[in-house]
């Protein structure tokens, strides 16, 4: 088997009926492998997302929580949704939506354009936040 890239740059394992998702940031790599489409994003909790928040978070998303990690969780969720959708040209603000973030339960509810709600998992570990969908 070979690992190659799809037309969108996503990893593909040629010759295998599996799906793979990969994300990396300084200090961490996250990988998910599943028999169904999957995606993952990882970011350090210390990254400052607040300056760019208005470019990817709607007013409704900014009102979901007063947790200081909300911008990071929404960013990771939208990156995960973008990868999961597998469609080029989706806009982080207008096409990808986060409807709920529950840090305690580790659940994010998101939506791609006008599609059905999707349940994503959220984990925090060692100063990193990971959001994935299997």
Annotate each language-model stretch with its function.
Residues 1-134:
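Core catalytic alpha/beta fold that binds nucleotide/phospho-ligands
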């Amino acid at each position: 088997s070979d690992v190659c890239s799809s037309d969108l740059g996503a990893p593909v394992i040629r010759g295998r009926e599996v799906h793979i998702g990969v994300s990396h940031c300084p200090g961490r790599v996250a990988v998910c492998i599943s028999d169904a489409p999957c995606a993952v994003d990882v970011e350090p909790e210390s990254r400052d997302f607040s300056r760019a928040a208005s470019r990817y978070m709607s007013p409704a998303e900014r009102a979901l929580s007063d947790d200081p990690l909300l911008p990071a969780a929404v960013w990771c969720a939208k990156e995960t949704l973008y990868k999961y959708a597998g469609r080029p040209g989706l806009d982080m603000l207008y096409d990808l939506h986060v409807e709920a973030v529950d840090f305690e339960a580790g659940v994010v509810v998101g939506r791609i354009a006008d599609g059905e709600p999707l349940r994503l998992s959220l984990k925090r570990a060692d100063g990193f936040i990971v959001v994935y969908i299997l």
